[in-house]
């Protein structure tokens, strides 16, 4: 009997989709001079597509799912979380060290900055070197809090947990839009708990997917039905089109539906293998890609002018850079993490 859980391979493939979305989102979510694109109703075609490519909820849901799986198997504790977080930070620090050194020559007015700036970036409190890593520390906080979060979820049930997480997230998002975005609150140490609470809904929903997946949501994939494949592809297209056209704060719902359709869709093995490979490298690709596309090598990346070429070049350099850095970080982790 085929497992009804989202497998590790499925999870890696979804992370692969998420990192492909992330590169697209960060490349084309802003207008850049010199890019040759089609314009529709006063907006570039690629900009129209970016709402469907918002990646953060994908990573949060897969993290919530995976950590809850670890929790119910009795392997989620302070020690395992400390190992997980330290490994994450070793990758983060290595990437930062290399690119900040490069930045000292290319953009000396920005790198390395004051001692306070260095401290905030090293800890992840305020990621001014590479703002797109903003959810690193909030994610770490959720990891450390996850045993208590999951314990509460077991006591009050999944639906009550979702309602509670929704209240926290809505409250945090209101405060962010009302006070942080307007500049009333500028202290990153005050912003941090708000940001963390704002991510809670996606994280808890991922854990709920683990609870529900046994019988309620994930269909067994025992046969490769061509008709089901067509239906799933059409559903994904419609869902993504709605996300692009309906500009409302429903990214979490969109991501949840996308994942449900995706894991129930019969897929080609070759496509899955490519996505899984990107998924395995997604952490470092996330950490490096905007150093190339925004902060240090912007003119080189966008110099290819056409969106497809720009995207492929960034994907290429981010992937192969991640191969090298992951190898170095792996060796460092083996020497540092000995518990």
Give names to the regions the model predicted.
Residues 44-56, 123-138, 176-205, 239-261, ...:
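Interfacial loop-to-helix transition and helix-capping segments at the boundaries
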Residues 67-75, 148-156, 205-218, 260-270, ...:
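Structural signal for the C-terminal ends of transmembrane alpha-helices
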Residues 21-34, 103-105:
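Alpha-helical transmembrane segments of multi-pass membrane proteins
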Residues 1-7:
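Short, Lys/Arg-rich, polar N-terminal cytosolic tail immediately upstream
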């Amino acid at each position: 009997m085929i497992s009804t859980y989202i497998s590790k391979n499925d999870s890696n493939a979804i992370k692969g989709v998420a990192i492909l979305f992330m590169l697209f989102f960060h490349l084309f979510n802003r207008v850049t001079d010199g890019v040759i694109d089609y314009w529709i109703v006063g907006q570039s075609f690629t900009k129209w597509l970016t709402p469907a490519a918002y990646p953060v909820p994908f990573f949060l849901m897969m993290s919530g799912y995976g950590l809850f799986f670890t929790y119910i198997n009795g392997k989620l504790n302070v020690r395992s979380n400390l190992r997980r977080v330290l490994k994450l930070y070793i990758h983060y620090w290595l990437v930062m060290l290399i690119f900040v050194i490069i930045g000292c020559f290319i953009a000396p007015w920005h790198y390395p900055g004051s001692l306070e700036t260095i401290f905030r970036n090293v800890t992840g409190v305020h990621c001014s070197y590479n703002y797109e890593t903003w959810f690193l520390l909030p994610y770490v906080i959720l990891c450390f809090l996850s045993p208590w979060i999951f314990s509460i979820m077991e006591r009050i049930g999944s639906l009550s947990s979702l309602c509670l997480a929704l209240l926290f997230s809505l409250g945090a998002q209101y405060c962010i839009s009302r006070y942080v975005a307007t500049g009333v609150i500028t202290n990153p140490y005050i912003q941090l708990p708000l940001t963390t609470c704002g991510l809670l809904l996606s994280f808890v929903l991922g854990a709920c997917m683990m609870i529900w997946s046994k019988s309620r949501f994930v269909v067994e994939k025992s046969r490769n039905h061509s008709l089901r494949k067509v239906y799933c592809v059409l559903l994904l297209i419609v869902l993504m089109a709605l996300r692009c056209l309906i500009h409302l704060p429903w990214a979490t719902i969109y991501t949840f539906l996308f994942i449900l359709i995706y894991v129930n869709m019969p897929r080609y093995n070759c496509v899955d293998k490519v996505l899984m490979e990107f998924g395995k490298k997604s952490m470092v690709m996330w950490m490096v890609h905007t150093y190339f596309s925004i902060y240090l090598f912007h003119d080189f990346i966008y110099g290819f002018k056409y969106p497809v070429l720009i995207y492929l070049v960034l994907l290429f350099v981010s992937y192969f850079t991640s191969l090298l850095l992951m190898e170095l970080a792996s060796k460092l982790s083996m020497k540092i993490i000995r518990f």
